[in-house]
């Protein structure tokens, strides 16, 4: 069993292994087996499409947490140019679980902010596995205020298990930092686009998620609590997480029906981790198109629509 593949992806892993073996044999033996290679490629594409066309909610949640799934720092060099990272909250520290800075999207200057989990063990520890402390959210707000001052659009990438629940974070005002971001983002006088690229966990995600347009990748997840946390509370058993996922309705299609997100961004066959370049091109075009729409509005209309959308969350529509 290949640990870089999820359980339901093992048939894909086996076929990819055979395909790589065939390619190596062809290179070493100088035998032309291009027809067989193409046949296996076609079979692999069909198999991947079949598996990913019928994923359960739990399987989608697993894809959202895939060990190879692209993070914020994977997307930035593919989507933006001239990225200049900015550091610190000017109050306490520089939280590496939040990255942000100025960049160019086409001919536009933008402020890019996102959660970052880290790829290897050292990076994961230094970035606290993508779980921000209060100083991370205050850094994000500082950058948003800077963007507002210079009339620069804000683009956020959401990918976190949740805000860090440690004692130190609570002492430094974790709940206040999150609440302040919600309050300020609701009326920030510049266009805001938020995109859930992996897992969006609770208030830790929402603190970057108040926006004019909320996008979500096809195999992302967005929820008030992690499935394991929900299962532990409801059933006293984290092993019930699979059932909790269905109840929580964490997937993009379910959230779109509830009008909790605005746009679902289609991923490459087999998920974003299979083709980061293609996924980045799709996001690049989606951001440009949406900024054209948002910047065509006057400020008062855009903020009014943002507030109306927020007020509509959770409306009871009847039986």
Curated annotation (Swiss-Prot):
The keyword Lipid biosynthesis applies. It is an enzyme of class 2 (transferase). Residues 36-293 form the CoA carboxyltransferase C-terminal domain. Pathway: Lipid metabolism; malonyl-CoA biosynthesis; malonyl-CoA from acetyl-CoA: step 1/1. It is found in: Cytoplasm. Its EC number is 2.1.3.15. GO terms for molecular function: acetyl-CoA carboxylase activity; ATP binding; carboxyl- or carbamoyltransferase activity. Its main location: cytoplasm. SUPFAM superfamilies: ClpP/crotonase. Gene3D superfamilies: 2-enoyl-CoA Hydratase, Chain A, domain 1. Keywords: ATP-binding, Cytoplasm, Fatty acid biosynthesis, Fatty acid metabolism, Lipid biosynthesis, Lipid metabolism, Nucleotide-binding, Transferase. GO terms for biological process: fatty acid biosynthetic process; malonyl-CoA biosynthetic process. It holds the Pfam family ACCA. It catalyses: N(6)-carboxybiotinyl-L-lysyl-[protein] + acetyl-CoA = N(6)-biotinyl-L-lysyl-[protein] + malonyl-CoA. Signal peptide: none annotated. The keyword Phosphoprotein does not apply. GO terms for cellular component: acetyl-CoA carboxylase complex. Component of the acetyl coenzyme A carboxylase (ACC) complex. First, biotin carboxylase catalyzes the carboxylation of biotin on its carrier protein (BCCP) and then the CO(2) group is transferred by the carboxyltransferase to acetyl-CoA to form malonyl-CoA. Belongs to the AccA family. Acetyl-CoA carboxylase is a heterohexamer composed of biotin carboxyl carrier protein (AccB), biotin carboxylase (AccC) and two subunits each of ACCase subunit alpha (AccA) and ACCase subunit beta (AccD). This is Acetyl-coenzyme A carboxylase carboxyl transferase subunit alpha. It comes from Dichelobacter nodosus (strain VCS1703A).
């Amino acid at each position: 069993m290949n640990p870089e593949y999820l359980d339901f992806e093992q048939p894909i892993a086996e076929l990819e292994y055979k395909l790589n073996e065939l390619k190596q044999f062809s290179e070493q033996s100088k035998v032309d087996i291009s027809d067989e290679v193409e046949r296996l490629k076609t079979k692999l594409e069909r198999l991947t499409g079949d598996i990913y066309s019928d994923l359960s909610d739990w399987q989608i949640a697993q894809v959202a947490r895939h060990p190879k799934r692209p993070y914020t720092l994977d997307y930035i060099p593919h989507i933006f140019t001239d990225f200049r990272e900015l550091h610190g909250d000017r109050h306490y520290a520089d939280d590496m679980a939040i990255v942000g800075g100025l960049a160019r999207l086409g001919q536009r200057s933008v402020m890019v902010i996102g959660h970052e989990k880290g790829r290897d063990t050292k990076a994961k520890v230094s970035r606290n596995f993508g779980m921000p402390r209060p100083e991370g959210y205050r850094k994000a707000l500082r950058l948003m205020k800077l963007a507002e001052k210079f009339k620069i659009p804000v683009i956020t990438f959401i990918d976190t298990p949740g805000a860090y629940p440690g004692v130190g974070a609570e002492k430094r005002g974790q709940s206040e930092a999150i609440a302040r971001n919600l309050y300020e983002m609701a009326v920030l006088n510049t266009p805001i686009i938020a995109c859930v690229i992996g897992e969006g966990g609770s208030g830790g995600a929402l603190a970057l998620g108040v926006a004019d347009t909320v996008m979500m990748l096809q195999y992302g997840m967005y929820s008030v609590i992690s499935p394991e946390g929900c299962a532990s509370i409801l059933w006293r058993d984290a092993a019930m997480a699979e059932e909790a996922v269905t109840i929580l309705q964490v997937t993009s299609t379910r959230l779109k029906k509830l009008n909790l997100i605005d746009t679902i961004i289609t991923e490459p066959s087999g998920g974003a981790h299979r083709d980061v370049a293609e996924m980045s091109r799709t996001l690049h075009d989606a951001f440009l198109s949406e900024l054209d729409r948002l910047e065509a509005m006057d400020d008062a209309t855009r903020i009014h629509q943002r507030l109306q959308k927020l007020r509509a969350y959770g409306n009871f529509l009847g039986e």
